[in-house]
């Protein structure tokens, strides 16, 4: 007789600690870490919800939490052991923002985890800091804007001081504040329906039958915002390729490029393939799309997504898109260059980016973007259309790149466009503001090559 021993399932707080350690100390991505943990452990619904809330909540409030830790600690926050810093942040987040959780549970669980992951001295330190907070919890008021405007905003919006300063200087305080507020909203799930498998109207009825409330995205006929019932959506719909989870802003570049059936299209920086498959669906799976990316494992992901969605016109291959490819000069009717960027438009979805970027990091992106755009221009047929896009709001990676390119390439001209709810482009360029679109920040430019 054999006995099978089930793998013990750690608590939501223990798993949140593990996830946050990987994100904050090992540069993992929160969404990928959470997907892995949720796939590995059969958590009850309430535990899965708490895990997700703790991970994203701590990341969204990290500046505020570290500031409080600094007020309570006899050591400088940066010198604290990472385990201590993360455990204190998890506990303080619960004590400050999850009032449904008893204070004793928040404190005792962190002390229990500390005993497993660090030495006794740190355990005592964690316990002492948390008990100290409970005694003083009503005394932690943020400094006012009159006292220190930059510190206030960095703590209130939970953004790095350099980013607060740069964007307030660039756009004015009111506009920057609106963008920072939008970044701290929990994003709604948005999906793109696959019309190759089912007409959009039929899919909309199917959502309703399943008790899933969805609202059409005005500028995207195949796009929907899931208002409620999102948990019921992660099943057959996705596995069968009936729909794809994608941010609304991310769907705009392909929409603007508007590839047609029978055309030849290049997606230069294609992984994970969301825009590639979107274009194939727009083309009715007729024509040809070459999809490039630098890394073979990402190419495998593009192929996997294409197969799942029933797409046969995508030809994906590993390429360094900065290297000249004379064999494909003037081959394509349309080219999409969704360029690598600083990612400063997607801070609501990829919360951790705000804690990884520094002002000096931003200089590395424009040279790469310029090189890629120069190559993209060579691959486009005369009379063809090129779309350049990024998921950042940094002007040096957006308007400046396109404006310089147009000055150097008189054979290219901007093509203006308009999208319902997002407004009209100016000189072929449109910034999608997260506070206006209720989606990620994006930049899209549409350029035509003369005959």
Locations of regions flagged by a protein language model:
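S-adenosylmethionine
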Residues: 1-451
